[in-house]
């Protein structure tokens, strides 16, 4: 059991156990000792559902990363390839199998595709002459991975690019399959709302899948009241802005991968007595797991960074007072009680030390002049100031050859806040970028245009002010310490995606029909009839539970905003978040960048 998955209204341990059971059953089918050959990308997501101890219990003795040529020597009966259905991986597998066949004693080969088998991949293995070598060729439907008690992700890094650039619906199919799995475990979701073309496709796929499985009536009592499917391209603006929550900033600066972050080690080195000892500083990055299993992290992760310092200093006083209690312990009983609390207190002290170090690292960035200048420009754009002309700060960034990703984020943000740039402004930016960073980046600029992130304003009309005012996307007075509105996550800007979720809950989307028509893609509502006997009756005062599924990625700041809404006393709705990928502005744009040869 992973305790942090079961704290919310929806116990996500049920899903984790279901996918673990499926994995155990496959491993047991391959009788005898085993080696797993991993597609490297899958090791992170797998770590969230099955640690090495589980694999070991089922006779997994060796683990290797999939590479071309020969496998390392392993005295095992079974070799299992655990891979995504990608053609380039099939070429490596074929090399491995052929070199093993030449090596001597025969092994049993198996392949487990995650999350689906692919006819194309099996054909490639056949063309390479190794398809017949596999005893089991199966799929492991790991569509949605539980990250936290209210958070699920498919961790499909190319989903946005596939959907919006390549017209490939594979990830939408996986999303629909994942939602069908959730409904099998947690009951039919009575109402589906959606906004966007991809949302419409996923809803259609779900209806079709449900028709195909009419034989089995779902008699599980529904846990979710609503499903909201949101296309990322309905709100392209939000991920481009700099996140200002604690967790969002950790991701922006260091990158959080599968709940882990790697940090500069020198901040975490134990303090030496008498100074000196600099040459003994650790050189390996400090790796920390970040989820709500850690009490302090759960408390500060969603706060605006400016509110984190006061929480940490308050915690320091409480912990220090708790340790002082040992001087007051006089009787054997009191000493015993203090000793029993010691492990928890020491863990709390370690946690505080880690987060104090992380906060210092972040503060070094957020107090820099460049961070302030960049944030000022972003906030001017989002509040509607000077969005229609070439920006001096962006010009300076290009002239000083700042990282290209930073420049692209700012230019795309300006484009989104002006419903596209004037043609001459767009041409100027493109020319400056290509001359400074290299003409090979023309492919990246084309991708950004195709995705709608960078565009020329058509018809001379800027719709952003209408959207901003109607949805209250910009708030001048933000209380970062004790927020009253979701705009605290960006210190003034309320994420459009989350505002849509909030307005759907109350008073409903009819109140914003005009804006919904301006935003891309259709908006719709579907009802799913519930089997008799499992109709949901809410208790007085009981909140609705809404699953918000972001198709194309979600940021930690948006997650924080939805958690804020869940905690409102009179909010009426608790949110569970699902997504194709956890993203920040840089990782999102990098997935759209064409790598120069």
From Swiss-Prot:
For this protein, the record's InterPro entries field holds: Sec-1-like_dom1, Sec1-like, Sec1-like_dom2, Sec1-like_sf, VPS33_dom3b
Work out whether the entry's keyword set contains Membrane: yes
**Subunit structure and binding partners:** Core component of at least two putative endosomal tethering complexes, the homotypic fusion and vacuole protein sorting (HOPS) complex and the class C core vacuole/endosome tethering (CORVET) complex. Their common core is composed of the class C Vps proteins VPS11, VPS16, VPS18 and VPS33A, which in HOPS further associates with VPS39 and VPS41 and in CORVET with VPS8 and TGFBRAP1. Interacts with RAB5C, UVRAG, STX17, MON1A and MON1B. Associates with adaptor protein complex 3 (AP-3) and clathrin. Interacts with PLEKHM1.
Predominant place of localization:
cytoplasm
Q: Which UniProt keywords apply?
A: Cytoplasmic vesicle, Endosome, Lysosome, Membrane, Protein transport, Transport
Compartments in which it is found: Cytoplasmic vesicle; Late endosome membrane; Lysosome membrane; Early endosome
Specify the taxonomic lineage. Eukaryota, Metazoa, Chordata, Craniata, Vertebrata
What's an example GO cellular component term for this entry? clathrin complex
Question: What gene is behind this protein?
Answer: Vps33a
In Swiss-Prot or TrEMBL terms, this protein is called: Vacuolar protein sorting-associated protein 33A
Q: Name one Pfam family in it.
A: Sec1
């Amino acid at each position: 059991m992973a305790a942090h998955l079961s704290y919310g209204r929806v116990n996500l341990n049920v899903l984790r156990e279901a996918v673990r059971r499926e994995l155990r059953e496959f491993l047991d089918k391959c009788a005898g000792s085993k080696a797993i050959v991993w597609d490297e990308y899958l090791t992170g997501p797998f770590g969230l559902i099955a640690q090495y101890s589980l694999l070991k219990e089922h006779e997994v003795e060796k683990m290797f990363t999939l590479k071309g040529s020969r496998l390392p020597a392993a005295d095992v009966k079974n070799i299992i390839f655990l891979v995504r259905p990608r053609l380039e991986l099939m070429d490596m597998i074929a090399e491995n199998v052929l070199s093993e066949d030449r090596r001597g004693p025969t092994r049993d080969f198996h392949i487990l595709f995650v999350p689906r088998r692919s006819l194309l991949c099996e054909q490639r293995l056949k063309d390479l002459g190794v398809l017949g070598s596999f005893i089991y060729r199966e799929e492991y439907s790991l569509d949605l991975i539980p990250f936290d008690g209210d958070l699920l992700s498919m961790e499909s890094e190319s989903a946005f690019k596939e959907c919006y650039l390549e017209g490939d619906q594979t990830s939408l199919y996986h999303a629909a399959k994942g939602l069908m799995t959730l409904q099998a475990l947690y009951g039919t979701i009575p109402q589906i709302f959606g906004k966007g073309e991809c949302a419409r496709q996923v809803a259609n796929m779900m209806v079709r899948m449900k028709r195909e499985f009419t034989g089995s009536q779902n008699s599980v009592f529904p846990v979710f009241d609503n499903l909201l499917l949101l296309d990322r391209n309905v709100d392209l603006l939000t991920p481009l802005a700099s996140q200002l929550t604690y967790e969002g900033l950790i991701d922006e600066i260091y990158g959080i991968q599968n709940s882990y972050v790697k940090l500069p080690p020198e901040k975490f080195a134990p303090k030496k007595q008498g100074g000196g000892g600099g040459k003994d500083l650790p050189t390996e990055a400090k790796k920390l797991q970040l989820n709500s299993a850690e009490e302090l992290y759960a408390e500060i992760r969603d706060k605006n960074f400016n509110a984190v310092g006061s929480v940490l200093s308050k915690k320091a006083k409480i912990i220090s007072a708790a340790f002082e209690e040992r001087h007051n312990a006089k009787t054997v009983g009191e000493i015993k009680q203090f000793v029993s609390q010691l492990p928890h207190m020491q863990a709390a002290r370690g946690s505080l030390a880690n987060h104090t170090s992380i906060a210092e690292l972040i503060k070094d960035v957020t107090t820099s002049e460049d961070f302030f200048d960049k944030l000022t420009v972003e906030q001017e754009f989002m509040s509607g100031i000077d969005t229609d002309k070439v920006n001096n700060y962006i010009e300076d960034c290009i002239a000083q050859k700042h990282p290209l990703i930073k420049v692209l984020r700012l230019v795309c943000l300006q484009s989104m806040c002006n419903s596209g740039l004037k043609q001459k402004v767009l041409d100027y930016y493109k020319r400056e970028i290509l001359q400074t960073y290299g003409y090979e980046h023309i492919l990246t600029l084309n991708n950004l245009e195709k995705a709608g992130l960078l565009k020329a304003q058509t018809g001379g009309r800027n719709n952003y002010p209408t959207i901003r005012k109607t949805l209250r996307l910009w708030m001048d007075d933000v209380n970062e310490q004790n927020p009253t509105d979701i705009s605290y996550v960006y210190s003034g800007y309320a994420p459009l995606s989350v505002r849509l979720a909030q307005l759907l809950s109350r008073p409903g989307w009819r109140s914003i029909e005009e804006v919904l028509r301006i935003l891309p893609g259709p908006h719709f509502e579907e009802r799913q009839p519930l089997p008799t006997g499992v109709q949901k009756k809410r208790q007085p005062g009981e909140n609705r539970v809404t699953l918000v599924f972001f198709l194309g990625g979600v940021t930690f700041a948006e997650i924080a905003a939805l958690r804020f809404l869940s905690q409102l006393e009179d909010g009426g709705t608790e949110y569970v978040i699902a997504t194709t990928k956890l993203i920040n502005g840089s990782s999102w744009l990098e997935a759209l960048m064409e790598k120069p040869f």
